[in-house]
Amino acid sequence: MMKFMCIFVCAIAAVSANAYGRQGYGSVPVGGYAYQVQPALTVKAIVPAGGYGGGSYGGGYGNNNYGRSIEVPVSAHYTSSRGYGAAPVDRQAISLAKLSLAAPNAGAPLVWKEPRQIVERSYGPQQSYGQKHSYGYGEQAQGASAAAASSSVAGQHSGYKNSGYKNSSY
């Protein structure tokens, strides 16, 4: 439904635009509403030779002046976005133009370059009442089994057998 309404409104706008006597290529109107979507170009805006406001719907669009355009400063052309003689002000494009004027030889686009920071979380002082070890639980278990194995090997070499003390040699 929304798509149909959008197509319907666009068709009415195209028919009414041609009804005002503007020239166009085929059925597509040229001129008139083009300034409403024209972005602000760096520091200067390209304007038709007759300007936007002279005559009916732009003096530069009639009289076969399609190829001619002049450059005027943005401040001289962009007055208010609500007035009929002005294009909407693209603040982002103007600020980018000011940045490019401030650093003309930058080359690469301006990117915020900062090394990555590793954030270490700190949860405050930790209180522990147990004995602190410098090794983990798995290493502690391996150390205990290695100590038991070494003691059993030492017992075998000194005359003890694996079965215990009942077969002792004294």
Curated annotation (Swiss-Prot):
Residues 146-170 are annotated as: Disordered. GO terms for biological process: chorion-containing eggshell formation. Coiled coil: none annotated. It holds the Pfam family Chorion_2. Keywords: Secreted, Signal. Residues 146-159 have a biased composition (Low complexity). Its main location: secreted. GO terms for cellular component: egg chorion; extracellular region. It comes from the Eukaryota. It is found in: Secreted. Residues 160-170 have a biased composition (Polar residues). InterPro entries: Chorion_2. Disulfide bonds: none annotated. Residues 1-17 form the signal peptide. Belongs to the chorion protein S15/S18 family. Chorion membrane (egg shell) protein; plays a role in protecting the egg from the environment. This is Chorion protein S18. It comes from Drosophila virilis (Fruit fly). The gene is Cp18.
